[in-house]
């Protein structure tokens, strides 16, 4: 797993292991991830959500499938599907919801992040 070096120094992340559910992984998102994992044919995969520098607002969200879980990753399970977040990204995602939406304009994973001060029009980047 790579270290994200472009992020500014932030306050230490809260002890997320003592928080009941620091990040919400919706049923709709879990169902879509399950479908994509079945298409990949690898039941060991989990969806990793991460933050990296970039985008029009300073930070951007990233999604990838990962079969490796680091010891300090947060793992959130919904309906038997796992979402992974590294501690550095988690400090920017505390209290957020990872959802999946479908509309006339398309389908996408969406992050509703209460820590974001501003977001870009497409919702892929934010500032804190």
Swiss-Prot record:
Binds 1 iron-sulfur cluster per subunit. Iron-sulfur cluster binds at residues 56, 120, 122. Homodimer. Pfam families: Fe-S_biosyn. PANTHER family: IRON-SULFUR CLUSTER ASSEMBLY 2 HOMOLOG, MITOCHONDRIAL. This is Iron-sulfur cluster insertion protein ErpA. It comes from the Bacteria. It comes from Xanthomonas campestris pv. campestris (strain ATCC 33913 / DSM 3586 / NCPPB 528 / LMG 568 / P 25). GO terms for biological process: iron-sulfur cluster assembly. Gene3D superfamilies: HesB-like domain. The keyword Ligase does not apply. GO terms for cellular component: cytosol. The gene is erpA. Belongs to the HesB/IscA family. Required for insertion of 4Fe-4S clusters for at least IspG. Its cofactor is iron-sulfur cluster. GO terms for molecular function: 2 iron, 2 sulfur cluster binding; 4 iron, 4 sulfur cluster binding; iron ion binding. Keywords: Iron, Iron-sulfur, Metal-binding.
